[in-house]
Amino acid sequence: MSDITFFIVETIIKAVVILSVIATLAGLGTYAERKVLAYMQRRVGPWMVGPAGVLQIVADMIKLFTKEDTMPSGANRFIFLIAPIISASCAFVAMSVIPFLPEFEIFGHVVRPILSDVNIGILFLLSVSGTCVYGTLIGGLASYNKWGVIGSARSVLQLISFEIVNGLSLIPVIMMVGSLSLIDIVHEQNNGITSWFLIKQPVCFVLFTIAAFIECNRTPLCLTENETELVAGCGTAYSGMRWGMFFIGEYANMITYSIVISLIFLGGFNSFWFIPGSLMIFLKASFIFFFMLWTRAAWPHLRPDQLMELCWKICMPIALICIFVTAFVII
């Protein structure tokens, strides 16, 4: 097989595998969240459908596919229909620059478990993940529903504000590595736990994690779908599979940021003691994902004014201080 043919086949297989695996994990994420919340609230959670209730995911999928796809009478039809697609597709496109595993060989060809190893990986990731806000924005505006409009406005407010914190928190890491490639950042941390950026840049780790909660619409930092105030926010007027696509995008974003935090701050897929790198990245990402679920059960929502104060008066100045201190140390 020629190199060009192998490259084309490899790229197609990677795209299909990433799409199918992440979509499956997003479904499992809904099950995991329900079981974790149930455990923390001393409930059983899903248990009737399949062993330990694991087939509840299939039952929910059948329900979403068979429910009527309604639309408000005053909604903009075209924009209303494409908004969930934008939210879900942006979450999956952002994964194209993420190295999920260490490279390995097949039939003498080196396979790198990344769809596109561009030298601006972090910039691409932040740009595409930031585009997800358009799906939420136009979905709420096009639904002709007051809860949807308010939810979309609050979504834009929080996402645009914390996009700045998201980017600034990564600048010290980029300055120390000298590259925007996620693979280069992982290789910079291959000298044990002391080389992890969690140790070198702990403040940036906290800031980026806070911004990740905002990007994924996770409690306690979510203004988009606060049930006690906005019903379901921008998704109030949606039903069926289009409603489900918003949540597929949300859980896909959670998986993406769990992996990205593991790659940038927790050593990525570098092996640790006797644990191989492929298992290490899975364990680290699973811990971050569980942390996102745990905070929903443990912490209440912040008010919009509290969230904006956290962004502009606390996170932003701290991020700038980290940049200046890192620059001073490097120079």
UniProtKB/Swiss-Prot annotation:
Entry keyword Cell inner membrane: yes
Family statement: Belongs to the complex I subunit 1 family.
Gene for this chain: nuoH
Spans through the membrane: 6-26, 45-65, 78-98, 120-140, 167-187, 193-213, 241-261, 263-283, 311-331
One annotated GO molecular function: quinone binding
Topology class, membrane: Multi-pass membrane protein
Protein name: NADH-quinone oxidoreductase subunit H
NCBIfam families named in the record: PRK06076.1-2 (NF004741)
GO biological process: aerobic respiration
HAMAP family associated with the record: NDH1_NuoH (MF_01350)
One Pfam family cited in the UniProt record for this chain: NADHdh
Catalytic activity: a quinone + NADH + 5 H(+)(in) = a quinol + NAD(+) + 4 H(+)(out)
Role played: NDH-1 shuttles electrons from NADH, via FMN and iron-sulfur (Fe-S) centers, to quinones in the respiratory chain. The immediate electron acceptor for the enzyme in this species is believed to be ubiquinone. Couples the redox reaction to proton translocation (for every two electrons transferred, four hydrogen ions are translocated across the cytoplasmic membrane), and thus conserves the redox energy in a proton gradient. This subunit may bind ubiquinone.
Keywords: Cell inner membrane, Cell membrane, Membrane, NAD, Quinone, Translocase, Transmembrane, Transmembrane helix, Ubiquinone
Complex and partners: NDH-1 is composed of 14 different subunits. Subunits NuoA, H, J, K, L, M, N constitute the membrane sector of the complex.
PANTHER family found in the cross-reference section: NADH DEHYDROGENASE SUBUNIT 1, NADH-UBIQUINONE OXIDOREDUCTASE CHAIN 1
Enzyme Commission code: 7.1.1.-
GO cellular component, one term: plasma membrane
Subcellular location as annotated: Cell inner membrane
